A protein has these predicted regions:
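Solvent-exposed loop segments that connect transmembrane elements
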Residues: 1, 40-86, 123-142, 173-200, ...
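Outer-membrane beta-barrel channels and translocator barrels
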Residues: 2, 14-19, 107-109, 156-158, ...
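Gram-negative outer-membrane beta-barrel transporters
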Residues: 12, 108, 112, 227-232, ...
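Transmembrane beta-strands of outer-membrane beta-barrel proteins
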Residues: 22-26, 112-114, 161, 222-226, ...
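Transmembrane beta-strands of outer-membrane beta-barrel pores
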Residues: 28-34, 118-122, 165-171, 180, ...
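C-terminal beta-signal and adjacent terminal beta-strands/loops
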Residues: 275, 350-362, 382-435
Length: 435
């Protein structure tokens, strides 16, 4: 259950100040976000072929179900039952910010845009895992001042260059599960394994630089947008695994970078044919030394072997960031013509390339390497006279390409990897009516 309340107010100048040179915007934002998160994850740990559900569940078998013992040591029997993960979590977040932006015309052909935003974010959490084996309450506050500074210059009546510096911010928060401290390991008689996932995680900041060009060419029949950018991350948030089994959450990579180049081109080749192309080139890497435990490697060890799990850590410096394909492309040709009856016919050819990428920062070749794929789509549309009825014929993934759109590897317990496949070839017919 999620309950979110937001409120935002803006004041925008309706007449430029300072002899028509200054436009301004000021505003405020508020958000309250509450979650009731109840998870009952089952797994056939005893290999009976039948799950031993919680007895209070309506679908549980009365002669083969689980009743939790809240006493000691009975509460720990949960780890020998058919459970993967159990939690009752009630996190909440309250956020507010105030901001302002001004655009100042230095001349008829140049402008300076600057903005400032102050944000304060407070989180609270109340978590109980595996019924009553562990409970956790925490509260924290992050505040950050972010900014933007952009210079624009009109090279001609139809082209503009810009340079932008921006700082962004993602607040920290709390985890459902996290590692035991070394003192807790010693007290419990476990092998000592320093924590890699903590009760809370830090805020993430990113400093970006972008330089670009926007131009209208060919007497306005072509629009080209070019941009080169760099992102420098501090405390990049990512999903991490702890040496203690069944424990993982969000952690922070101290330093990482991403840079890229984007091309957007749209051209009216003729009165009937339009060409539309979007290209993106990315390069990313972790730039600081940072040790990460891959749950896929650690899963072979369990309770009592936390030190062995800890020893499997790897330095991810130089690894690619997650889900950052080096090259993507989307190319469209659209042809429009009118029949003698007045019906508008639109045909679209689309080519999509999604480059290969690593689905996690661990860059494990067994599960993280996601191959590239190419898609070809066709659409033939008819907009009949009167603009009331429309009919579209579509062939999606015309070559029936196999591909993985994305994947996710569990960081908590079972180390399973789920794949999101692209749809196979599809034939679609769409009838539309405007009224």
């Amino acid at each position: 259950l999620v309950d979110t309340t937001t409120f935002e107010i803006n004041l925008i100048s309706n007449e430029p100040a300072m002899n028509g040179k200054l436009d301004w915007t000021i505003g405020a934002f508020y958000m309250e976000h509450e979650i009731e998160n109840v998870i009952r994850g089952y797994r056939d740990n005893d290999l009976t072929g039948q799950l031993r559900y919680l007895c209070s569940e309506s679908f549980a078998s009365s002669d083969y179900c689980y009743t939790h013992d809240f006493g000691i040591p009975g509460r720990f029997d949960v780890f020998g039952a058919d459970w993967d993960f159990v939690t009752d979590a009630f996190p909440s977040r309250e956020s507010y910010s105030v901001y302002g932006q001004i655009t100042y015309s230095l001349s008829d052909t140049s402008r300076l845009i600057s903005g400032l935003r102050y944000s304060e974010d407070t989180f609270t959490t109340d978590v109980t895992n595996f019924f009553n084996v562990e409970s956790f309450q925490e509260k924290g506050t992050n505040d950050e001042t972010t900014w933007k500074l952009t210079g624009e210059i009109d090279i001609s009546d139809s082209s503009m260059a810009y340079l932008s510096f921006t700082r962004g911010f993602k607040p920290g928060g709390s985890n459902l599960t996290f590692g035991f401290t070394e003192a807790q390991d010693i007290e419990a008689g476990r092998p000592v394994a320093p924590a890699l996932v903590f009760p809370t995680f830090e805020a993430e900041t990113v400093d970006s630089i972008e330089i670009g060009l926007k131009a209208d060419l060919n007497e306005g029949r072509t629009r080209a947008n070019l941009a080169y950018f760099t992102y420098t991350y501090d405390n990049l948030q990512f999903q991490a695994t702890d040496p203690d089994p069944y424990r993982g959450g969000v952690a922070n990579i101290p330093e990482s970078e991403m840079s890229g180049f984007e091309v957007e081109l749209k051209s009216l080749v003729s009165d009937s044919l339009t060409f539309d192309m979007n290209l993106a080139f990315l390069d990313s890497e972790v730039t600081s030394d940072y040790m990460v435990l891959d749950n896929v490697d650690a899963y072979q060890y369990f309770f009592g072997q936390e030190d062995l799990r800890y020893g499997l850590r790897e330095n991810v410096k130089g690894n690619e960031l997650a889900k950052s394909p080096e090259f993507t492309a989307d190319v469209n040709f659209t042809y429009e013509t009118s029949l003698s009856s007045g019906t508008l016919v639109t045909s679209i050819f689309q080519f999509i390339h999604r480059g290969d990428f690593q689905q996690r920062v661990s860059n494990n070749p067994a599960v993280d390497a996601i191959d590239s794929y190419d898609l070809i789509n066709f659409t033939l549309g008819f907009d009949f006279v009167g603009d009331k009825w429309g009919l579209d014929f579509m062939i999606l993934n015309a070559t029936d390409e196999d591909g993985v759109n994305s994947s996710m590897t569990d960081v908590f317990g079972v180390a399973a990897t789920g794949l999101e496949l692209i749809p196979p070839r599809q034939y679609m017919l769409r009838l539309s009516m405007n009224y």
